[in-house]
């Protein structure tokens, strides 16, 4: 059965888009099961502690979520509103109109004040993507996947090469 699994994994496929993603999911599911069955043949079945049953990625995801929640809790209110409502982090100039009517500022001074605040906010606040951890680090992590997916689509790749990314 092991030789059949090896020949199946060395089979070359040429898929693109959704079909490639479906194949990746199927291969990852099958390679996980085959790894489990091979390890069960080699080692006797012993009960594992509950902590080992929970996959490590869940613990890492939990840590990441906690860090993000703490970070978001410390954000200025304007940025919290931008993250939750997907609105610009700065108020629109129309919201300043009542304040302008009650003040002695000229319209030109008022426009200058708004521009200064917008440029200060742009300089001091990183983009929304950085707050969510989706900056260049995540893009670099995706680059090998993109290269492999392009190869699988244009030339073809083995199921084993897809299984390496499970």
UniProtKB/Swiss-Prot annotation:
Heterodimer of a B chain and an A chain linked by two disulfide bonds. It comes from Pan troglodytes (Chimpanzee). The lineage of its organism: Eukaryota, Metazoa, Chordata, Craniata, Vertebrata. Residues 37-139 form a propeptide. Relaxin is an ovarian hormone that acts with estrogen to produce dilatation of the birth canal in many mammals. May be involved in remodeling of connective tissues during pregnancy, promoting growth of pubic ligaments and ripening of the cervix. Residues 1-5 form the signal peptide. SMART domains: IlGF (SM00078). Keywords: Cleavage on pair of basic residues, Disulfide bond, Hormone, Secreted, Signal. Expressed in the corpus luteum of pregnancy but not in the placenta. This is Prorelaxin H1. It holds the Pfam family Insulin. It comes from the Eukaryota. Disulfide bonds join 16-153, 28-166, 152-157. GO terms for molecular function: hormone activity. Its main location: secreted. It is found in: Secreted. Belongs to the insulin family. GO terms for cellular component: extracellular region.
């Amino acid at each position: 059965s092991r030789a059949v699994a090896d020949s199946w994994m060395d089979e070359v496929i040429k898929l693109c888009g959704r079909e490639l993603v479906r194949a990746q999911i199927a291969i990852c599911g099958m390679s996980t099961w085959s790894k489990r069955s091979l390890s069960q043949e080699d080692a006797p079945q012993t009960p594992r502690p509950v902590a080992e049953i929970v996959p490590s990625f869940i613990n890492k995801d939990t840590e990441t979520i906690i860090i993000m929640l703490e970070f978001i809790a410390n954000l200025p209110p304007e940025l919290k509103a931008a993250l939750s409502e997907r609105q610009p982090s700065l108020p629109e100039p129309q919201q300043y109109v009542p304040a302008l009517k009650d003040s002695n500022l000229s319209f030109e001074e008022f426009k200058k004040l708004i521009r200064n605040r917008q440029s200060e906010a742009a300089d001091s606040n990183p983009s929304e993507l950085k707050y969510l951890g989706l900056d260049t680090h995540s893009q670099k992590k995706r680059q090998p996947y993109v290269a492999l997916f392009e190869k699988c689509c244009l030339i073809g790749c083995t199921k084993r090469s897809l299984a390496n990314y499970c």
